[in-house]
Amino acid sequence: MQPGLKAVWHDFRGNLCADIEAAPVKGEYVVESVSIPEEVKGNIGLVLTGYLEVPADGIYTFALLSDDGSTLMLDGELLGDNDGAHSPVEIIVQKALKAGLHPIEVRYFDCNGGVLQMELVNEKSEKEVLPSTWLKHE
């Protein structure tokens, strides 16, 4: 496993995350966080894939912020649906996870604005940076 997530940038002009991969690929990157690579500008359709490696069994809470749409798949399950054209909107999602690797996919598109961020929410409901060491790819 390598550090970070794979990020594929598509030249996307749509309004639904499910349609991103039909658009032409403009670039491929590795990112250390759920975010937009600096080089990515203009029409953005982004698909981030890899694994989330959690250190211990537990119930994990995540905050996903995006402008415009985003979706979060974890272990093949649609965990967060923040799809559609909108100003910045944050959703909070929870999932019980066993220690170890879990497949993750984040889809994101931007019509105008450009915000994508995923954070960990601790037991005190405080947001923390998702540790970059938790993100891996093959």
Could you describe each region identified by the protein language model?
Residues 1-61, 65-138:
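Extracellular/secretory pathway-exposed regions associated with glycan biology
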